[in-house]
Each structure stands twice: as C-alpha cells, then as structure tokens.
Amino acid sequence: GTASAMPVVERYQSAHVLEIRERLFLIDCGEGVQRQLLKNRVSLAKLDSIFITHIHGDHLFGLFPLLSTLGLSCRNTPVVIYGPSNLAPFLNFFMSYYGKGIGIEINFHPLSLKEPEVIYETKSIEVLAFPLNHKIETYGYLFREKMPQLNVRKEAVECYNLTLSEIGAIKRGDDILRPAGPDDGASFMNGFVRHSGTDEPLLIRNDEVAYRPYVPRSYAYCSDAAPSPELYTWVKGVDLLYHEATYLDEMADQAAARHHATTLQAARCALEAGAGKLVIGHYSSRC
C-alpha cells in the first residue's frame, strides 16, 4: 500500500512483496496486507522471509493476522522474521497467547546495527539491513542478486571441442591457450574462428565463448526515513529505490519534525545514489 499512519479508503498501508528467483519476500506488514495478497494472487506457500522496518502500527499491525493464516495453512517450515530488537515483545506476546493454537514456529532475527550488514544470504541473493533516520529504531533493506556464474555457449563447445577442464576454466573467467598442433586448422563455425594453424597457439577468449545468464538486479526499501547523508552511499547504484515521501515539499517543516521525507527529498536521494528508478509512497492523508 501507499498510505501512511492514518488509514484512507483508497490506499492500504505499508507492505511490499518482492520476488527473486522464485522466492517471495514480504517487507513490512501493515493492515490489510492479506487482502492485497489475495487480490494480487500472491501465494503464501512461496513466502520465504518477512522483513519489518520498525514497530509503528502502519508497518506492523497486519503481521499477526498473517501469522495466524500461515498457521491455518499448515505451513511446515518456520516463519523467518527480521526486524528491530524491540519487535521481540510483540512476537512473544502473540506466541504466548496464540502460538500453540496456530502451530507455527517463528525464527526471529533481531537487528541492532549502526551501518549496513548482510543479514540474509543464499547462493544467488543477499540482503543487507541498514539504519534509517526516524523517530524510533528503524531499518531499511537492500536486496541484491549476486553475479551469476559464467555459462559457456553451446556452439563454442562444439566448435572448439572443449574438454571438461577447459569448460571449468572458462566458467572461472579464464581464457584458454592451446599449444600449436597439427589439429588446429583454420576454419569458421557458428561465428567462431578457428584460425591457429600448426605454427601458432590457439587463444580462446573468454569474452567470446562465455556469457552470464542474467544481469544482477537490486532493490532498496527505505521507509520511514528522514534525509541522511549516509543513505546515499548505502544504496549507491541500486536499480530500484523505494523511498517514503510522506509530505509534499511545501510541508518540509512537518516532515523534519516527524522524521519523514518529502517528495523532493526522496527524489534527491535517488539522484545522489544514482538509482535506476524511484518509487515513492507512504503518503500522508493530508496530501
């Protein structure tokens, strides 16, 4: 949703679903999140982890009904939650009254950070948490795909009759240098040139025979967040930046007093960070 603390008819409160490599990550969990998940046909079975930025109600109060639903759905893996350490009493209260009844296990990872730190990692993904400038302990999250391993073009394997050891070397980023020999005749095949001859070694260039299956992408979630100079560097070069923009620029004094950002400040953060695209939200009901 794009609403902030005060509920409005047209907009739901903060919650984003991010899909990476067939894994779903839920970032914040405001009221109405389950309805939006159902409306957009998001499968809870694919939910990997939940990331809470801070314990203000418009970012949190949809979590406990969602946990109940996950229990009713007979989830057989723990619900993994990351968030500020002061989220723990809320989870403990919920589990002490309802935990046995819903039959789920919660693995909570409390955060207490002064600078960015990797909090989640797989072979293909990493998530960093970093502190945000807000009235209470608040964290932003940066999701990054890792650089994928090089693949070798099928036509190159056929053209050069690559051995398994040569394929392994190419996947590590190496060039292949074959010594001169009687079998290195000059020929063309599928765009590759076999031009060595018997008197010269054959150089197989890595950049001609290898490729990466995809370009790694990144996404940063920054809410709630008043401007801070460190934030620009922490999300430097991100492909997609979500930054709260609670107020219009003419309400900058109110934004500063409440540790929020204006639309112009969100745009400036994206510009300074060199973000590819900017998405804004968390709009005040006054705007």
Language model region names:
Residues 1-42, 76-78, 141-143, 150, ...:
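Conserved beta-strand hairpin/beta-sheet module of binuclear metal-dependent hydrolase folds
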Residues 17, 112-280:
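Metal-dependent phosphodiesterase/nuclease catalytic metal-binding core
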Residues 27-30, 47-55, 83-84, 219-225, ...:
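Active-site neighborhood of phospho(di)ester-bond hydrolases with catalytic His/Asp-centered motifs
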Residues 31-82, 110-112:
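Active-site metal-binding motif and surrounding structural segment of the metallo-beta-lactamase
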Residues 34, 59, 249-250, 287:
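Short glycine-rich, flexible loops that bind phosphorylated cofactors or substrates
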Residues 66, 260, 287:
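An N-terminally biased module of ancient metal coordination in phosphate/nucleic-acid-related enzymes
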Residues 75-112, 286:
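Active-site neighborhood of divalent metal-dependent phosphoester bond hydrolases
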